[in-house]
Regions:
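Short acidic, S/G/P-rich loop/turn micro-motifs used as interaction or catalytic elements
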Residues: 32-33, 99-103
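Alpha-helical sensor/transducer elements of the RecA-like P-loop NTPase core
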Residues: 11-15, 92, 105-167
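Mid-core helix/loop region of P-loop NTP-binding domains shared across ATPases and GTPases
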Residues: 57-94, 101, 112-118
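Short beta-strand/turn micro-motifs composed of small residues
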Residues: 2, 95, 128
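Conserved NTP-binding/hydrolysis module of P-loop NTPases
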Residues: 37-60, 81
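P-loop NTPase Walker A phosphate-binding motif
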Residues: 1-28, 41-45, 131
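A short hydrophobic beta-strand->loop->alpha-helix junction that borders the nucleotide-binding pocket
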Residues: 2-5, 25-35, 60-66, 151-152
Length: 167
């Protein structure tokens, strides 16, 4: 989901999960989360809301690099994906306000790799003010694995506006 501020991305997602009662983890990203290490920890803890044992190997790992090398990033997303692969519970991971960390290479690198190896029982929803520039998005779109909601999808039609004010 990508659209400007105030278009209702977060509200629409919250309403969807309330209505469907589907299992989900929700990570509301803040400006302070623009470092890969806290980002991964917060992501793991958000998933633990659905799967309490998730991420033990990541949290036990001695992650202390301020500027991790590609080998460390590869190890982290491998551990993360391995932990996702053993989850039997279907659920959705929501990353809300992703635009706040979209400029961080390490976060984009890890998220793009996670998307590539995401098990079929787990969905990932990104809510952002801008469309991420990941190369994997084109592949997903061509394979019919990407649902993209844009700003126009959040705008009311004239009929919807009329119904809104009549109710």
């Amino acid at each position: 989901l990508h659209s400007g501020a105030g278009f209702g991305k977060s509200s629409a997602l919250a309403q969807y999960f309330y209505d469907t009662k589907e299992a989900f983890s929700w990570y509301s990203i803040s400006e302070e989360d623009d470092n890969i290490l806290p980002f991964l920890r917060y992501l793991v803890h958000s998933i633990r809301r659905v799967v309490p044992t998730f991420g033990s190997s990541l949290l036990e790992d001695n992650i202390h690099f301020i500027y991790p090398k590609e080998t460390e990033l590869t190890r982290w997303y491998s551990l993360f994906c391995n932990e996702l692969a053993i989850i039997n519970t279907p659920f959705t991971i929501v990353l809300d306000d992703y635009h706040l960390v979209d400029h961080v290479f390490h976060i984009n690198y890890v998220i793009e790799k996670i998307i590539e190896f995401l098990p079929p029982s787990i969905n990932l929803v990104i809510a952002s003010r801008i469309r991420p520039k990941w190369t994997v998005l084109l592949k997903l779109k061509l394979n019919g694995q990407l649902v993209e909601l844009k700003e126009q999808d959040f705008m009311f039609s004239e009929e919807e506006i009329q119904v809104f004010f009549e109710d």
